[in-house]
Amino acid sequence: MAEVGEDSGARALLALRSAPCSPVLCAAAAAAAFPAAAPPPAPAQPQPPPGPPPPPPPPLPPGAIAGAGSSGGSSGVSGDSAVAGAAPALVAAAAASVRQSPGPALARLEGREFEFLMRQPSVTIGRNSSQGSVDLSMGLSSFISRRHLQLSFQEPHFYLRCLGKNGVFVDGAFQRRGAPALQLPKQCTFRFPSTAIKIQFTSLYHKEEAPASPLRPLYPQISPLKIHIPEPDLRSMVSPVPSPTGTISVPNSCPASPRGAGSSSYRFVQNVTSDLQLAAEFAAKAASEQQADTSGGDSPKDESKPPFSYAQLIVQAISSAQDRQLTLSGIYAHITKHYPYYRTADKGWQNSIRHNLSLNRYFIKVPRSQEEPGKGSFWRIDPASEAKLVEQAFRKRRQRGVSCFRTPFGPLSSRSAPASPTHPGLMSPRSGGLQTPECLSREGSPIPHDPEFGSKLASVPEYRYSQSAPGSPVSAQPVIMAVPPRPSSLVAKPVAYMPASIVTSQQPAGHAIHVVQQAPTVTMVRVVTTSANSANGYILTSQGAAGGSHDAAGAAVLDLGSEARGLEEKPTIAFATIPAAGGVIQTVASQMAPGVPGHTVTILQPATPVTLGQHHLPVRAVTQNGKHAVPTNSLAGNAYALTSPLQLLATQASSSAPVVVTRVCEVGPKEPAAAVAATATTTPATATTASASASSTGEPEVKRSRVEEPSGAVTTPAGVIAAAGPQGPGTGE
């Protein structure tokens, strides 16, 4: 019985150790799964030396064996229960290790009651079943397949594949089963059909860009510019340009300025030119350095034709070599490497390179030595000109159709405009002279650079802009012209007076006066009025005091329409008081220069007492044929209006009564004689008529037609207008 009990206990222990849920096997599996959590192995104990075998244990009673068996059985049961309790913990730990595996989170999936971080490149979404588990279970809904969605990450994008038969909505767009993988945006929402289950997807992947290198300065090391500007040659700087068409040229009567008059202006131009040359050379040097920096890096992507000549390309290629020499194939390789345009362009540019190498004297052919491998000769740059050619190798050439670079303030030509006699400071040595069309450069600018130049320009009595014809060198640029001042003496101009009518508008009664004159060469009509009554009731214009000359004589005048006729206003002379004369109406001869024909018309009419302070019309300062004097304060109580010849004829032909004014003074017995004397002195060139004398009752009479009376007739109305013809100083009383 003892053997049977011992055998049964040993079998029970063996069964416990070999069971799947054995604590030993579970511990071994846990140690394999979690090596860090496994306890360190116990140090090996030294084995005792071999000796006599131990005595066999005493035999146990059957109860003890049964107890041992029962205890062993109980221990086996307790072991089974311990293993059964430890198994779910191990499964949960394994699941947690899958979901919380080390590594950065790639995406986040959020639901109503969960949040899942995607750390693996592929995740499956569905519902758990006996056939297998998924990474993210969405519950037990039958509308969700066991494997419904699969999310995969392929840097830098996420892709979604639908595996469920019901499909899925992605931001409202239906994705069917078996459709190609859909690239997901940064954020989107999944919704399972026929359910309210939603998953919010958010990408957490951010591509870590390498930190940008700090920007280095464009020109870290700029050596000081060493520029040598030779002394300018006046003959080379002066570039006379023909006068453009359509401009106003200076009159030939003005004397030409001497050759050395504008020498100081060259100093001003030289300063501006030197500044512009400095700026241009600095820009060229900066462009060459920038081009050199870009050529040292990767191949440029600009496929446009480079703005360099073939000779410049050859110089760039040869100067980039270490030994300053290249073969023809090396030159080709350098050009195609740095300028992609020549990679796809026609091969004709290679012929141009060969022609430049063979025909340009700056390129020297060096034969290859026998020791050097390869074939073909080397090309070098002439050492005498290498520095200059390398400096100009990256200077962009001027495009076609664009004007060449020139100094905006071009050098002044020696043929500058003469100085104005009234403004000597304008042509001072500092300003250098006013620019005329002949001295303007092709790209010249009329804007003054000197601050005093503008003020001096403003002092010019008259300047104007002239627009050149299209196509001329200075087209579309204003040209400042200096016009010489006009001579002080008034030149007689053939100004034709049309027949006019001067009508008084404020006198209550009197005469309707009509003045007709034939095209004299006189510059103005003069009307004389005064508030004091003359001796015979008329306004009298006299030659002057007894013994006086016409230069000192004049009258208080009122210029009628001189501005309309384009004549200048200049100071005039008038009497302080108008002398009263006898009953003779006198005429005034022309005061023009001798030999210049002309007529001066003086209109005389009855004077009316005028109240002071009403309608003061100031006398403007004018000039009568170049004579000067002091104007007087005269009151113009009448408003005059000039009418056209058609209006005059219409007035004469109309049946309406003429404008009448009341007679102020009675006519003396000397008036007819004075009228006869005035009529006898008139010339055929001028004629005046007076019509419509008033009756004693003040009522107007019917207008009578104008008739030409014989020279001997003495019947003249009381109101007379006398006209003066060219007569000598002794003519008239």
Curated annotation (Swiss-Prot):
Q: Chief localization class? A: nucleus
**Biased composition range(s): Basic and acidic residues:** 700-709
Q: Which residues carry this modification: Omega-N-methylarginine?
A: 161, 191
PTM info: Phosphorylation by GSK3 (GSK3A or GSK3B) promotes interaction with YWHAE/14-3-3-epsilon and retention in the cytoplasm. In response to mTORC1 signaling, phosphorylation by GSK3 is prevented, leading to translocation to the nucleus.
Cross-referenced InterPro entries, in alphabetical order?
Answer: FH_FOXK1 (IPR047394), FHA_dom (IPR000253), Fork_head_dom (IPR001766), SMAD_FHA_dom_sf (IPR008984), TF_fork_head_CS_1 (IPR018122), TF_fork_head_CS_2 (IPR030456), WH-like_DNA-bd_sf (IPR036388), WH_DNA-bd_sf (IPR036390)
Low complexity composition bias: which ranges? 676-697
Q: Mind telling me which Pfam families this protein's record contains?
A: FHA, Forkhead
User: Which spans does this entry mark as compositional bias, Pro residues?
Assistant: 37-62
Which part of the chain engages DNA, per the record?
A: 305-400
Which positions does the record annotate as the modified residue Phosphothreonine? 245, 247, 422, 436
**Residue numbers spanned by region Required for interaction with FOXO4 and MEF2C:** 95-420
- Tell me the segments the record calls region Interaction with SIN3A and SIN3B: 2-40
Q: What is the effect of changing residue 127 to A?
A: Reduced interaction with BAP1
Q: Which UniProt keywords apply?
A: Acetylation, Activator, Cytoplasm, Developmental protein, Differentiation, DNA-binding, Host-virus interaction, Methylation, Myogenesis, Nucleus, Phosphoprotein, Repressor, Transcription, Transcription regulation, Ubl conjugation pathway
Q: Which residues carry this modification: N-acetylalanine?
A: 2
Q: How does this polypeptide assemble, per the annotation? A: Interacts with SIN3A and SIN3B (via PAH2) to form a complex which represses transcription. Component of SIN3A-, but not SIN3B-, containing multiprotein complexes. Interacts with FOXO4 and MEF2C; both interactions inhibit FOXO4 and MEF2C transactivation activity. Interacts (when phosphorylated) with YWHAE/14-3-3-epsilon; promotes sequestration in the cytoplasm and leads to impaired ability to bind DNA. Interacts with FHL2. Interacts with SRF. Interacts with DVL2 and DVL3; the interaction induces DVL2 nuclear translocation. Interacts with BAP1 (when phosphorylated).
State the name under which the record lists this protein: Forkhead box protein K1
